[in-house]
Amino acid sequence: ADGSLTSLDQQMITGEQWEALSDEEAYERAKDIRVMSRARPTDKQRLVAMLQKRGEVVAVTGDGTNDAPALHYAHVGLSLGSGTSVAKEASDMTLLDDSFKSIANAVMWGRSLYRNLQRFLFFQLVVNVAALLLVLGGSVIGTEMPLTVTQILWVNLIMDTFAALALASLPPSHEVMNEKPRKASDFIINKSIGFGILFCGIVFFLVMFALLVYCERRGKGGVDVHELTMFFTTFVMIQFWNLFNAKALMSHHTAFRHFLKDRGMILVLVLVLVGPVSYTQLTL
């Protein structure tokens, strides 16, 4: 019971008590404070500054003139639509409906967009790692470039562009709200994503390199044009797997969940399927 009271006392403080603390004491106490009563504008601003000093990302809501300093110094200042003009000018955005649910929805959309960017980077870097290794592998076995410059440009400019639009437009998911907050200094490609990029890129390379070696040893004259065309088509078709991997990245659901509702994803899959056929007809 005594421990609970002590913990509760640490979570509550008055404006006068907060002002009486030294900077060192305020720095240590800031992480435990949950309620501050009779707080003046300078007290709120100091609390924001101490939390920022501890590396926290601080958002402040307020509707009065006395909230303006804290709204201005916070990373994200959120004024209420019914608040004063001073509070609105000091804030970064205004909640027109005065609802905390709008803040939660904004966080959900932001986290979902961040995850979609991670998905696109995963997709594109896997393609680039596999293509780079294939070009190097082709030079090792003494064959001509298995992927031509035109083919690489097609993959990067056409397929990657539409894949970016499809992955970036995936609808937000409530499951991102269960994630822990990230530090502002965290790199967008974390260790697990980096490992997945290398693993999938190497697997794609091994599959395609085995096909390249087979075509090289199959004929006496090396790899002919038709085999290179088949090689490129196979490389593009493997990106089906890559795209589904990217869609399911860091998700607890299968990539086929709500598949028919993802029109952008369907468009990319059609493009991946039809594109190589059209390219082959033009080159032949």
Residue ranges and their predicted role:
Residues 2-60, 74, 78-253:
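Membrane-embedded transport module
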Residues 192-193, 252-273:
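C-terminal membrane-solvent junction of multi-pass transporters and transport-like membrane proteins
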Residues 71:
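Basic, alpha-helical nucleic-acid-binding regions used in initiation and control of genome expression
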Residues 279-284:
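Conserved small/polar residues in nucleotide/adenosyl-binding loops
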Residues 67:
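Conserved cytosolic catalytic loops of P-type ATPases
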